[in-house]
Amino acid sequence: MMQAQQFAHLVLEWYPRFGRKTLPWQWDKTPYQVWLSEVMLQQTQVATVIPYFQRFMLRLPDIGALAAAPLDEVLHLWTGLGYYARARNLHKAAQTVVERHQGEFPTSFDEILALPGIGRSTAGAILSLSLGQHFSILDGNVKRVLARCYAVEGWPGKKEVESHLWQISEDVTPAKGVGQFNQAMMDLGAMVCTRSKPKCELCPLNTGCMAYANHSWARYPGKKPQQTLPEKTAHFLLMQNGSQVWLEQRPPVGLWGGLYCFPQFAEAEDLNHWLQQQGIKSSGLQQLTAFRHTFSHFHLDIVPMWLDEVFPRGCMDDSAGLWYNLAQPPSVGLAAPVERLLHQLAKQ
C-alpha cells in the first residue's frame, strides 16, 4: 500500500507538467469563482460547464451582482445545465453572504459549510484552491482515484465507504501545496483515472495503485445498487398565439422549482377538462411527437399537445405565468424539455 507522503509527492510532481491550468475559473482564483465553478461541475462535464461559466461571469461577475439578480435571471443563465436546485442555492447563498457577511465571501470553513448548497468537499475546494487553506476534498473524480489506488470496496454513496475515503483523502493531503494537490487530484480523475478506459500507463500513481497491480480498475469504485426507475407520464399543453406561447412558473420548491413550464397534466382527460373550464375550444388540439426525459429517480414520458390561435384570457393573465415570445425570448429559466419544445415551435 502506498504511503501518504509518497502519494502526495507523486501527484504534486505530475501536476506542473500535465495538470490543467488554463480553465476559465483558474485565471482569477477568487472564492466566488471557485465556488461557482465547483457547483457547476457537480454532475456536469468540464466541456459543458465552460460556456455556462463564462456567460454567468459576464452577467454576474461577483457575489453582490448574483445576490441582487432576480432568481428568474439566475435560472435563465442556468438553463440547460440541469439540477436546478444548484442555481437556487447559489442565489440563496449569495444573498446570505450579503446579509450576514457584508458581501464578503467567508473564509471560515464552518461559515462556508453553513451556506445553502455547500457541502464538505465544496467548502474544502473553495478554501484550498482560492486561499491555500489546508482542507481535503472528495468529489467524484477524487473518490475514483482513491478507491482504485487503495482498493476501497463498496459504493461511495454508502456512508461507511465515503467515511473511509474521506479518511484516506485527509491522510494523503500534504501540509504544503494543498491547492495545487487538490487541483491535481481532480485533474487525475478527469483526465487519467477516468470511469472507463483509464490511462493507467500515464498515471503517476501506477507503481503503488492496487487496482492497477491486480488489473481490477473496473471494480472500483463500487457501483450503485441497480434500481429500476419508475415511469410517469405528463401531458404538456402548448398554447400558442402567433409568436407567443403560454408558460406557467413552477412553485419555488420541487421538480423544476421556479422554472417556466407548459401547463402540465397527468391525463389527457384532465387537460381537456381544464380547457373546458377556461372556455377554450379543444377542437384544434394536436398531439406532437412524444419523448422521454429521464431524471435521476424516474423516467418522464412527455406527451406534447399543441393548440394554436389561443388568445389571452382568464387564468392566462395570471402573474404566475407569461406569454413567451419565440421571436424575442425573455430571460427566464426553462426546464430542458420545455426549451426543446419551444425551439421546435420556433422552427415551425
Model-derived features: positions:
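Intrinsically disordered, low-complexity, charged terminal extensions of DNA damage-control enzymes
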Residues: 1-22, 26-27, 190-348
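Catalytic cores of DNA base-excision repair glycosylases
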Residues: 3-201, 205-218, 231, 280
